[in-house]
Amino acid sequence: MMLTQTRRHFLIGASLLPIVCAFPANVVAEENKPVIWGPPAGPSIVAAYAVKTGMLEDLLPGCQFKVWNNPDQIRAGLSSGSINMAILPSYSGANLYNKGLGVRLANILTDGLLYIVAPQASNIKTLQDLVGKKLAVPFKNDMPDYIMQAILKAYDIKPNAIDIQYTGSLPEAMPLLMIGRVDAAVIVEPAASTVISMSTASPKKIVRALDIQKLWEKVSKTDAIPQAGLVVGKGFEGDEGKDKIKALNACFSDALEKIKADPEKAADEISGLLDFPPRLIAASVAFSHLVVHNASEVKPALETFFNVLIEQNSAILGGKLPDDGFYA
């Protein structure tokens, strides 16, 4: 059965918060205890740390953090109310809001996870260095593609000047890069840290060639791509919900300060929750552009990001920009 555009973009968007390994889904939370669901990736680091260290205990007694690996599970849970906190791509949250699911964006937890990686020997230092080369981009006609097209336009690079090779998944680009079928690849953190680490034992050392967030500044006048955050649903309505979100974001901000002060210690604390090696969690902190922004405070940056997407395919946001009710 063919996926609807809405569901397709939600599934792809959710997959862009990468799952580097396959994890068993743990869909049953302890009864009546609040749960924050997130991917085993950068945007979840802050939430997982806040839960693990008890920083949310006064606000959300008994709160748990659980990894999701099935976007359909999150979509259905938000719709039914059985899930009321989930870390998702910001545009996936907007899509659900526009479809009437009653969700809001509480915050932004990363200002961008996108990088271009390449063999060190290729000496790619600027976007212009990719002209005439093959660049792997995941998911044609979806977020990474739209971001790259907007950047190429901003830098006056003609669409065919770089030979874009589309892949159907994030991992697919890595073997292509290692065997020389492509010269560089668009990838997200922490997958970038993972492939760089793995390549140290290979004759072909992979490096982080370009930070796409810095290239984005030519498009939006800011180097922040508000890519993902916490989407909240049932239990966060009205003035009481606003107060709860404000308090939650304050806890997250305190958690982020502690994480940045000692990434290795934080990684040791949460590796069990994320089911990810501590050294890779610690390495990814420096490159995940972790932030805690109230969604309403970064609405202009979100709308700039959303407009780039919607101008190329309105279905990715459910047909329109979300109204003010989306931004908590």
Predicted feature descriptions by range:
Residues 3, 9-28:
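N-terminal export signals
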Residues 57-59, 215-223, 291-299:
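Short, solvent-exposed loop/beta-turn-alpha elements that line the ligand-binding surface or hinge
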Residues 76-77, 95, 129, 175-176, ...:
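Well-formed, non-transmembrane alpha-helical positions, independent of function
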Residues 82, 87, 97-100, 139, ...:
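Sec/Tat-exported extracytoplasmic proteins
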Residues 237-312:
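Secondary-structure end/capping motifs
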Residues 303-328:
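Conserved C-terminal helix/tail region of periplasmic/extracytoplasmic solute-binding proteins
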